[in-house]
């Protein structure tokens, strides 16, 4: 356990949070580069893309780590049985799915731009997959946290209480 939550909640939640911050920094940097320089020649053509990719990969890894830390033990009542006799917290499945959707959208975005040119706005289909996957991974982290509260001694407000303790 880390604090009052099981390790399969605390560790992946921290990794997902840090990874999303890295991806967000990359996204803001990428948008500013596109505003200044226009379309870049490929998916790995500017350094901001590496931050985005690293962040999205971290999100996917956090879901995989949550599954790996539970193994063959059923972690919560809402856990899902995997084909290899392992159990997965529902939140971990949501996080993995969101991370995978975002990572798949990255090369699709390059194909989209090669076919249709530069987007007029940020809200093209592949950008929605990228942003949506990252955003909904937060929902997966909340679900994972709620599952941990069910089996641990923590509360749903524990992260808020922790931050309040740091500020006070």
Description of each model-found segment:
Residues 1-40:
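N-terminal regions that are enriched for targeting/export leaders
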Residues 16, 20, 49, 53-56, ...:
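Residues within membrane-spanning alpha-helices of integral membrane proteins
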Residues 22-29, 55, 62, 101, ...:
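Membrane-embedded alpha-helical transmembrane segments of multi-pass integral membrane proteins
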């Amino acid at each position: 356990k880390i604090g009052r939550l099981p390790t399969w909640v605390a560790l992946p939640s921290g990794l997902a949070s840090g990874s999303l911050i890295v991806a967000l920094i990359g996204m803001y940097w990428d948008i500013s580069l596109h505003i200044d320089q226009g379309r870049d020649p490929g998916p790995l053509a500017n350094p901001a893309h590496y931050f985005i990719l690293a962040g999205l990969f971290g999100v996917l890894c956090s879901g995989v780590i949550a599954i790996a830390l539970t193994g063959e033990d059923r972690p919560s009542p809402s856990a899902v049985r995997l084909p290899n006799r392992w159990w997965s917290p529902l939140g971990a499945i949501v996080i993995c799915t969101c991370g995978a959707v975002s990572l798949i959208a990255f090369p699709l975005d390059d194909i989209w731009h090669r076919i249709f040119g530069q987007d007029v706005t940020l809200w093209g289909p592949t950008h929605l997959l990228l942003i949506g996957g990252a955003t909904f991974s937060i929902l997966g982290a909340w679900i994972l946290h709620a599952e941990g509260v069910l089996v641990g001694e923590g509360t749903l407000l524990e992260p808020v209480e922790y931050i309040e303790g740091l500020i006070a």
